A protein has these predicted regions:
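Hydrophobic alpha-helical segments and their helix-loop boundaries in membrane
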Residues: 1-256
Length: 256
């Protein structure tokens, strides 16, 4: 064995690093702006070296031209960004649920900086997204990310044509499922808001002189947050189960 890396080995390492680095750039909890670029770069390098013996056989040979090399690198970066964006987009389910909860508890005006989004959002939405990211690592779901990196080389082989139609269909279905899940997670608050508003309207009709708004506003916040706290365990469990199912789409290629 040669004591130094050959040109083919360097080429394989560059291809692996291109896809894995792009995926890690988008993953929840790892690709955030508050995570140091040095940490992300080091993690991508370590994971690339660890997975090199496993996926080196699925990589194309060294092209004869610089243009060919650049084309392969760009292709792998695009594939990595697509996979990472798909895994990250499912967090919009929690953002949707948080916005609905905030609207139903009259807390939509309470805006805060959301570290997982580029724009500020409601406090409830930021809390749910941070909770979801924490659960991903607390339940070892991030292990499926590593298995998914390996499996992605079987689902989207570097030597096969890049089929964007299938991935676009998967992305559309994922966005639709994320929105539907967000509404489902906020269903207890929607039911509570419907009953509470009907009761408040009935009281206002029965006792016109009673100041319903001044009594209903604090009760809406108190009871709404109580219902939200009681349903929080179910929200976390349902989300992490659905997220693991999404991650297994790629991990399944590696026998995950």
């Amino acid at each position: 064995m040669e004591p130094y890396a050959t040109s083919d080995q360097i080429w394989q390492g560059a291809l692996i690093f291109s896809r894995i680095g792009a995926v890690l750039l988008m993953l929840p909890g790892i690709g955030e702006s508050y995570v140091s670029p040095r940490i992300r770069l080091s993690l991508a390098l370590v994971v690339s070296l660890a997975l090199w013996p496993v996926i080196a056989g699925a990589l194309p040979g060294l092209p004869a031209t610089v243009g060919g090399m650049a084309g392969w690198i760009i292709r792998e970066v695009i594939v990595g960004l697509m996979i990472g964006a798909l895994l990250r987009s499912f967090l919009t389910a929690l953002a949707t649920a948080g916005e609905i909860v905030a609207l139903q508890t009259t807390l939509a005006f309470a805006q805060t900086t959301n570290p997982l989004q580029a724009s500020p959002g409601t406090t409830v939405s930021a809390f749910l997204m941070l909770l979801g990211t924490t659960l991903i690592f607390a339940t070892n779901t991030h292990h499926l990310f590593i298995a998914g990196l390996v499996g992605s080389y079987e689902l989207i082989s570097p030597v096969a044509p890049l089929v964007t139609g299938d991935f676009a269909s998967l992305a559309i279905r994922t966005f639709g499922d994320a929105f539907m899940l967000g509404v489902q997670l906020s269903a207890p608050l929607l039911v509570f808001a419907l009953i509470f508003n009907l009761a408040s309207g009935l009281v206002g009709r029965v006792m016109p002189s009673f100041q319903v708004f001044f009594a209903a506003a604090p009760l809406s916040i108190l009871l709404g947050l109580s219902v939200f706290a009681l349903s929080l365990g179910v929200v976390g469990t349902v989300f992490i189960d659905r997220y693991r199912a999404l991650a297994r789409i790629f991990a399944g290629g590696a026998g995950g």
